[in-house]
Amino acid sequence: MAEKRKIILDVDTGTDDAIAIMTAYLDPDIDLVAVCSVAGNKPLPYTTENTLRVRDVLKADFPVYRGCATPMVSTLLPNRHGGYTGQRTQVEGMEAPIEIHTDYLELPPSTRTVEKEHAVWFYIDTLMHSEGDITLVPVGPLTNIAMAMRIEPEICKKIKEIVLMGGGYQRTNTTAAAEFNIWADPEAAQIVMDSGCPIRIIPLDATHRACINADESRAFRALGTPVGKAVADCVDHRILAYSHLQ
């Protein structure tokens, strides 16, 4: 049997990252070492609580570490401190506009808490004591990882690979030239790109080709499990919001 691939997820959990956590945890070929939260689509308290809610739905025991609440450098543009509200759209028959990323996922409040150690120190401690066999998978701003690299540059030699979602070649989602995860903390992105670590970038051009539709959402819901329902709820929310943004 092939050895499981050890990964640490770094997330700014909304509906998309919730599915990423569930997918990673349930993949038989992955050993989910931990999940670290960071400010991004929503401020840190929301992304952290959402991560804990997903863990509860999974009935999992992987540790969750709270990370950085702001970008590495002072605010240069509005909303770069996790105050980004995302796109909103008004849906006929509904009083309030729908946000792509709501503050809280529609899951029960978490009954558990994060680890006491900060995510940055967790990265340093874990990687420095590892055998170089851990892959980092950030799907939000790169603040936590970049900060750890600045504090202890030696961790770069211990990272097996960084597989990140960020950037775009022909697609953007924040400005005419920027994808959100890079835009939210470009200094952190520069540090990670210059780290010398093996890096694979999954840009918007790729993620926008990995579509999921209403039929697949219904199939998840038909599983009749808490996780199936949670995935379907996340997908249905995005379908509803995006269908009114087109």
Give, region by region, the residue ranges found by the protein language model.
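N-terminal acidic, glycine/proline-rich low-complexity segments
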Residues: 1-246
